[in-house]
Each structure stands twice: as C-alpha cells, then as structure tokens.
C-alpha cells in the first residue's frame, strides 16, 4: 500500500470564524493513520477566507470518506470540498 495526499478546501461559517482555531482542531479529529500536512488560508469572497489543507495517509479503502466525515464535524466549518487526491 502506498500513501495518498488529499487536498481539501474548508469554508468557515462566517468571516468572523477563527481560521487559526479551525486549523488547530483538525489534527484532533482525523483518523489515527492520517496526518495534517501543509495548510494555507486564502481570501475567497465577501470577506471569507478558505482554509486549504493537505491530509496525508495510507491509501486504503474508506480513508477519504473517514477524513471527510471528520472534517465535516469540525465546529465553525460550513463546507468541506475534496479538491485533489493523488498517490505519493
């Protein structure tokens, strides 16, 4: 089995959401075999900032679904979009 990199765009609920706190909480909700790689906060629209993250983990069945479910459970996150998926 190889490793997979998943690139997500997380959209906070409002422009007032603390994006740093959201990033800090990500590692705590991920499956055991997943880790937070790079992250970046980018202006999106109407004062909202998108959080772009890369999650690394083992390429196994159900991995992306588990990660996405965990990210959807984060406080102050409105949407989670998988933008890219690739083997490393």
What are these model-derived regions, one by one?
Residues 1-88:
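Long, contiguous binding/interaction regions
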